């Protein structure tokens, strides 16, 4: 509580009277702050900190931030289907002071997404995992990967059943055996490995994770940018959006499309290079079209025009 009017009145006693006083205080606080008139959209505080102004980056207003940036529990629960998680975020980021600070994750030591089964390590499949990682590493927010997910470690195992199952047979089992061996890194996502860890790093999802991580690291717009999914700038894609970040030394713009084609409109003319395939497109009419993509495939066209 940041309002001293209420914080200073809180009673830290444990008697029935103390508890009753605090309950009444909570009710009084609620009634005083409540201005709900039947239309949540008109009364709920909103923020544009995560959104581009058109396709122009703007500074963030953190004046209403609580200081308690969140793990993105809502997206987490919906990551059984990446598009559901994405749609929720696009429609609700306005209710967070700055969703670019949200930590995105699929699973954790407590829960998997609601579908297929939140009580077990995620069993949605390798392709769904890859699609989720595409979104996590190119959308707003901070990606977070739970240990072992890059090899679908213990998928289908109950995450926790207390003393009723052994730790080894749970989703919280020891992962160290997968990391035995040697890794020599020469640069970000560039390495040689031997032993069991080499097999771990050679798994399809590990390779995919390394790729999307390297793409994110190379493109400032993906690391720190705001986004827009407005139909003024992109149509036709299930998960397609424009990312941009600008500071005194950087102007980074990227066009992202995941698992479907899309048409980007009203964008700067010039050269665009796809960070995934290396494909080059030259835009002359403000429009760039991405052909249809299969699930978990992605294109990230980076603007290399003059000034970028």
Question: Each PLM stretch: what is its role?
Answer:
Residues 108-111, 125-126, 135, 144-147:
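Glycine-rich, aromatic-lined ligand/substrate-binding cores of catalytic
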Residues 254, 284-308:
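C-terminal beta-strand-rich structural cap/linker in extracellular carbohydrate-active enzymes
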Residues 109, 113, 140-144, 155, ...:
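A generic secondary-structure signal for well-formed alpha-helical elements
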Residues 115-118, 147, 156-159:
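Short, solvent-exposed loop/turn and secondary-structure capping segments
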Residues 98-122:
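Active-site clefts of carbohydrate-active enzymes
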Residues 107-110, 140, 259, 276:
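Short, flexible loop/turn elements at secondary-structure junctions
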Residues 117-126, 281-292:
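Short, polar loop/linker segments at the starts of domains and inter-domain junctions
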């Amino acid at each position: 509580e940041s309002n001293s009017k209420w914080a200073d009145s809180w009673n830290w006693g444990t008697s029935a009277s103390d508890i009753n006083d605090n309950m009444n205080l909570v009710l009084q606080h609620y009634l005083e702050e409540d201005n709900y008139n039947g239309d949540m959209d008109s009364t709920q505080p909103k923020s544009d900190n995560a959104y581009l102004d058109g396709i122009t980056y703007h500074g963030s207003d953190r004046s209403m931030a609580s200081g308690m940036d969140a793990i993105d529990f809502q997206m987490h629960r919906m990551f059984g289907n990446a598009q559901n998680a994405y749609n929720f975020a696009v429609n609700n980021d306005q209710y967070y002071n700055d969703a670019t600070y949200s930590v995105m994750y699929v699973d954790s030591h407590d829960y998997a997404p609601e579908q297929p089964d939140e009580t077990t390590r995620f069993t949605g499949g390798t392709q769904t995992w890859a699609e989720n990682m595409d979104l996590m590493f190119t959308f707003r927010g901070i990606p977070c990967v739970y240990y072992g997910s890059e090899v679908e470690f213990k998928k289908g195992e109950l995450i926790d059943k207390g003393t009723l199952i052994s730790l080894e047979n749970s989703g919280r089992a020891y992962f160290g055996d997968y990391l035995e061996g040697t890794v020599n890194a020469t640069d970000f996502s560039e390495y040689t490995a031997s032993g069991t860890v080499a097999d771990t790093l050679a798994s399809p999802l590990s390779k995919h994770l390394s790729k999307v991580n390297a793409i994110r690291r190379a493109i400032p717009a993906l690391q720190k940018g705001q986004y827009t999914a407005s139909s003024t700038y992109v149509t036709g894609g299930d998960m397609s959006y424009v990312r941009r970040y600008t500071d005194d030394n950087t102007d980074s713009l990227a066009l992202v499309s995941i698992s479907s084609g899309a048409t980007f409109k009203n964008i700067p003319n010039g050269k665009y290079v796809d960070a995934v395939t290396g494909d080059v497109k030259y835009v002359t009419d403000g429009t760039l079209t991405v052909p249809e993509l299969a699930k978990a495939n992605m294109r990230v066209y980076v603007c290399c025009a003059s000034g970028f």
